[in-house]
């Protein structure tokens, strides 16, 4: 392991949109205030290059927000990091205006983020791509020792930081029934869809028979993937019609509420109101009220496109019945409402079935390349069970944002926040709740596998689900409250005065800062607030 003698003023975990916005706010601060003390910064990113949802960069996919909710406009409209600055630098400003829409394509917004990522580096922000942080410990002289490693070579490096920002992003939420199949070459979360679907279908070309694809989920990603899969299947020769089954637990797909009044829940002012609400019960009620702005819903334009396809199928079937003319061979989309997945098994070319547990090994995953799947589902209203064979399973079940806890609780600095390796659940609370005193909970939790009827989710849970292979006995879960300031700083436990560095969280604080926290809506404003809080420390100590 090598050691870097440089002490960084700020080290960031991750270099996605949240920390790019931080980098942009920092470089603007450097321009405005040459005496600003936070100058030497480093962000550590696991990917080899900047990537933003590459698995969902689908043809014609649109963003769900105005371009004005970019990395900087709501904070500093004349910032060099705005979407308009990007368009101007790319000589597309007039062309974009002529489009007559404030909503860019997902491809263009991804390119904007990549442009901004490079621009902050050009302006002095250091980034280590292809590396990941593996340890955080107390360092000398009021610093944090940060140990990271090269993902490819596994070489480790030790550095020191005066302050730390953790912006880990989300990780795919995997339903229990799919856990054994995560390494299967023809099973994928929507986050990897565009990167994998080509190889999946290429591996099935030799079959020359109708293919059947299952898509699990009822949100925007599930709907987009369903349409894209149908379009791709149309170019694959077959002796019959390919089928795409969209499995949803609801009775129907629901539209997202993007009306002007509902959209105000994503305004920066709503962050203040949410944070100052001194009751978890009330915050949960607000979340439930506005759930249809973001969770398990589909943009009305996408719904219309999907329904038009299904209506066309019904029209073709009716014309065929009346005229006795064969229907077009276009792939068929079937939406299956009130559907719960009970079990999945793989089936070999000879019809033999293989338990999912065997696929957890590399050998099992390799041996499964020519297998299909048998899925048993249950209609949640009638209780009727059915069995269907599939060639590909895609799941758009959202993301969970608690993976950072596993790293953090095993670090040397976790003790300053009352977190230990035995902590199995962290509950984020706003510092406004401290009026009632800190809370610490230990309770018994039944960790037996969940029942089949509740094993699949269309909306990601707020924490990872219990593994279906866990022991069916009660286990003690230690739940620890972790408090955040309005400026996103993790607050040390009561009586803790030995930790001088500040630790900030980004993009995982929906429970404390509201619905917009995991989205792009407030990135620019939030970055400005964090940088201002960092600056206040140095001003107050001057």
Curated annotation (Swiss-Prot):
GO terms for biological process: biosynthetic process; intracellular iron ion homeostasis. The keyword Flavoprotein applies. Residues 447-472 have a biased composition (Low complexity). It catalyses: L-ornithine + NADPH + O2 = N(5)-hydroxy-L-ornithine + NADP(+) + H2O; L-ornithine + NADH + O2 = N(5)-hydroxy-L-ornithine + NAD(+) + H2O. Keywords: FAD, Flavoprotein, Monooxygenase, NADP, Oxidoreductase. NADP(+) binds at residues 218-221, 294-296. Its cofactor is FAD. It is an enzyme of class 1 (oxidoreductase). Belongs to the lysine N(6)-hydroxylase/L-ornithine N(5)-oxygenase family. This is L-ornithine N(5)-monooxygenase. The lineage of its organism: Eukaryota, Fungi, Dikarya, Basidiomycota, Agaricomycotina. The gene is cpf2.
């Amino acid at each position: 392991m090598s050691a870097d003698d440089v002490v960084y003023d700020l080290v960031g975990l991750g270099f996605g949109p949240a920390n790019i916005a931080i980098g942009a706010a920092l470089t603007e601060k450097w321009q405005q205030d040459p005496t600003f003390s936070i100058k030497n910064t480093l962000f550590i990113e696991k990917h080899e290059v900047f990537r933003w949802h590459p698995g969902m960069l689908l043809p014609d996919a649109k963003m769900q927000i105005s371009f004005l909710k970019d990395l900087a406009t709501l904070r500093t409209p004349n910032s060099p990091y705005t979407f308009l600055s990007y368009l101007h630098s790319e000589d597309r400003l007039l062309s974009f205006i002529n489009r007559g829409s404030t909503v860019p394509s997902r491809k263009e917004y991804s390119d904007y983020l990549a442009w901004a990522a490079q621009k902050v580096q050009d302006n002095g922000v250091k980034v280590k791509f292809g590396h990941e942080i593996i340890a955080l410990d107390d360092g000398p002289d009021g610093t944090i020792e940060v140990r990271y490693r090269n993902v490819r070579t596994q070489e480790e490096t030790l550095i020191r930081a005066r302050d730390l920002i953790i912006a880990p992003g989300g990780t795919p939420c995997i339903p229990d029934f799919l856990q054994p199949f995560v390494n299967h070459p023809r099973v994928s979360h929507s986050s990897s869809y565009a990167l994998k679907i080509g190889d999946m279908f290429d591996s099935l070309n030799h079959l020359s028979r109708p293919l059947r694809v299952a898509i699990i989920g009822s949100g925007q990603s599930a709907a987009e993937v369903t349409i894209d899969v149908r379009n791709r299947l149309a170019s694959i020769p077959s002796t019959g019609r390919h089928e795409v089954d969209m499995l949803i637990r609801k009775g129907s797909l629901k539209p997202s509420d993007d009306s002007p009044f509902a959209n105000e829940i994503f305004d920066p002012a709503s962050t203040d109101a949410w944070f100052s609400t001194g009751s978890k019960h009330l915050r949960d009620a607000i979340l439930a009220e506005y759930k249809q702005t973001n969770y398990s819903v589909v943009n009305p334009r996408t719904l219309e496109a999907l329904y038009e396809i299904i209506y066309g199928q019904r029209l073709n079937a009716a014309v065929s019945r009346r005229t006795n003319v064969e229907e077009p061979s276009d792939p068929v989309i079937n939406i299956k409402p009130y559907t719960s997945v009970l079990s999945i098994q793989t089936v070999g070319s000879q019809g033999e079935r293989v338990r999912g547990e065997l696929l957890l090994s590399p050998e099992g995953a390799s041996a499964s390349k020519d297998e299909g799947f048998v899925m048993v589902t249950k209609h949640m209203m009638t209780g009727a069970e059915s069995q269907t064979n599939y060639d590909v399973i895609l799941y758009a079940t959202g993301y969970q944002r608690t993976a950072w806890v596993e790293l953090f609780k095993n670090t040397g600095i976790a003790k300053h926040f009352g977190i230990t390796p035995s902590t199995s659940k962290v509950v984020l609370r706003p510092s406004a709740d401290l009026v009632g005193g800190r809370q610490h909970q230990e309770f018994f939790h039944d960790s037996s596998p969940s029942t089949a009827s509740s094993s699949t989710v269309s909306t990601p849970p707020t924490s990872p689900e219990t593994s279906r292979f866990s022991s069916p006995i009660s286990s003690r879960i230690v739940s620890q409250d972790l408090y955040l300031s309005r400026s996103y700083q993790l607050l040390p436990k009561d009586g803790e005065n030995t930790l001088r560095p500040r630790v900030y969280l980004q993009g995982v604080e929906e429970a404390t800062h509201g619905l917009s926290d995991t989205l792009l809506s407030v990135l620019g404003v939030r970055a400005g607030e964090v940088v201002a809080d960092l600056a206040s420390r140095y001003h107050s100590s001057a």
